[in-house]
UniProtKB/Swiss-Prot annotation:
Molecular function in Gene Ontology: RNA binding; structural constituent of ribosome
Gene it is expressed from: rpsI
Keyword Repeat annotated: no
GO cellular component: cytosolic small ribosomal subunit
The name this protein goes by in its record: Small ribosomal subunit protein uS9
PROSITE patterns: RIBOSOMAL_S9 (PS00360)
Taxonomic superkingdom: Bacteria
NCBIfam families, sorted: PRK00132.1
Species of provenance: Vibrio cholerae serotype O1 (strain ATCC 39315 / El Tor Inaba N16961)
Keywords carried by this UniProt record: Ribonucleoprotein, Ribosomal protein
């Protein structure tokens, strides 16, 4: 592995992302595709770029990302978490800024399981008085 490469693992829902950061020109590659090509929707692209915009390093770092599992939203969240961790490895002084924005904390919310006798996790069958 290169000397000036920094790594972070991010997770969200059932997605896991591995993020490699190195000094560069702001090139973001996700699963061998560009950011805009991988995430069609602008919302997901915005979520991915949030930690970089916060510390003003969008044009200063190149990112190589592999992500597996889950859907679009979960993958975007996992990538954001991974980028945050890699940035903290790159420069520890960024931690308080990223912490204040809420990017350091792993979002532990998961899909609640379906229960027996119910239609969904909490949705009960329709009640009939007679």
């Amino acid at each position: 592995m290169a000397e000036n490469q920094y790594y972070g693992t991010g997770r969200r829902k059932s997605s896991a992302a591995r993020v490699f950061i190195k000094p560069g020109s702001g090139n973001i590659v996700i699963n061998k595709r560009s950011l805009e090509e991988y995430f069609g929707r602008p919302t997901s692209c915005m979520v991915v770029k949030q930690p970089l915009e916060l510390v003003d390093m969008v044009e200063k770092l190149d990112l190589y990302i592999t992500v597996k599992g889950g859907g679009i939203s979960g993958q975007a969240g996992a990538i954001r978490h991974g980028i945050t961790r890699a940035l903290m490895e790159y420069d520890e002084s960024l931690r308080p800024v990223l912490r204040a924005a809420g990017y350091v904390t792993r979002d532990a919310r998961r899909v609640e399981r379906k229960k027996v006798g119910l239609r969904k996790a909490r949705r009960r069958p329709q009640f009939s008085k007679r």
